[in-house]
Amino acid sequence: MRACVPLTVAILCGLAWAGKRESCASRCNERFDRDAVCQCDRRCPQHGDCCEDYEQLCTAEENPKEPELFLELEEETEGAPASSLYLAPNSCQGRCLEAFDKHHSCHCNARCPEFGNCCEDFESLCGHEGFSHSSDAITKEELQSVSEKIYRADTNKARKEDIVLNSQNCISPSETRDQVDRCPEPLFTYVNEKLFSKPTYSAFLNLLNNYQRATGRGEHFTAQELAEQDTFLREIMKTAVMKELYGFLHQQNRYSSEQEFVSDLKNMWFGLYSRSKEERDSSGFEHVFSGEVKKGKVTGFHNWIRFYMQEKEGLVDYYSHIYDGPWDSYPDVLAMQFNWDGYYKEVGSAFIGSSPEFEFALYSLCFIARPGKVCQLSLGGHPLAIQTYTWNKSTYGNGKKYIATAYVVSSTH
């Protein structure tokens, strides 16, 4: 499949037409706007309420080589971009060689020994072959290599004949805010539902009815629903995709055992946190794979299986798309507009035809290797970028961060 407009054009037009309330276009360093969905002032990273394009638009001078990306124009998360999976102010875990930050009580940069303000574990973590040592960093080339291996390992993905997609009307990025249904037919003409009898698909589907989409309403799991989370993790860990991912992360000194890895996946993906007031109303899994509604708009919802099932029930109305990826087989990528039972999604990117474990693996890989950053991968010889965000308002374990969101932002450099 091919992009209906050049991706660079889509980027520029998307940024130019991004609504004042949803983008930092022409808003960088403005004062706090209480009426805006997201913020672009200098303190928004501290408060976790930046617009998604804040880092690309407002920190360009600090990151001059940051690639232009196909950006979603909606508020996805209150988690600000972060350089580390950890929020442990008294530790160097995940912080080795970071830039000096006057707000930290101790430091992990190269000059902290000179000034005598290193964290106590600086020497053990940053001076040797520790978890965060610079020589232990995962390179772009390594990410591209392992993502190709994961791509080849996805034997549970849909075959060409398993899905008939009717993408119909392709619009320009300037039209995404119009909320006009330009596609009279459903997106999915046919899906071979035998796919859903496979263990990982079946376990994945069992999770989707465990959530209520409105933020502000607390999530409370039954014993059965908690068991379904364990079943899903157990089933995907049997696949070549997840074995490839774990083997890579183990080799990179991220995890010492599969048990540690699975435990961390459960926390980062299924751990609950609050996107609204005090209620624990959200998780990375719910946001990314099931979808949520906040302030009258769809957020998250980046999964084709969820989309198909909701469309089949008449709850999703496909409106249009602005991007169709270059892959001529599955998985592919589609960036689309749709209405979810009364609520609009302005730009939602999703893999199409991938197995649950494939998406889970790539998003996890990028969150672990490039938390809060753009993650450059390669699939079938085509470049692909994934953006993740960390949840910064609460943590688990020793200051580790939850997943706020993860989604495809580009399939070109």
Swiss-Prot record:
Key words of the record: Disulfide bond, Endonuclease, Hydrolase, Lyase, Manganese, Metal-binding, Nuclease, Repeat, RNA-binding, Secreted, Signal
Localization annotation: Secreted
Family matches, as PANTHER family: PLACENTAL PROTEIN 11-RELATED, URIDYLATE-SPECIFIC ENDORIBONUCLEASE
Entry similarity comment: Belongs to the ENDOU family.
InterPro entries given in the database record: ENDOU, EndoU-like, EndoU_C, SMB_chordata, Somatomedin_B-like_dom_sf, Somatomedin_B_dom
Quaternary organization: Monomer.
Catalytic residues (UniProt): H287, H302, K345
Gene from which the chain derives: ENDOU
Cystine residue pairs: C24-C28, C24-C40, C28-C58, C38-C40, C38-C51, C44-C50, C51-C58, C92-C96, C92-C108, C96-C126, C106-C108, C106-C119, C112-C118, C119-C126
Signal peptide interval: 1-18
Organism of this sequence: Bos taurus (Bovine)
Name of protein: Uridylate-specific endoribonuclease
Location of the SMB domain: 20-63, 88-130
GO MF annotation: an example: metal ion binding
Biological role: Endoribonuclease that cleaves single-stranded RNAs at 5' of uridylates and releases a product with a 2',3'-cyclic phosphate at the 3'-end. The UU and GU sites are more efficiently cleaved than CU and AU sites. Targets mRNAs to regulate their expression.
Source superkingdom: Eukaryota
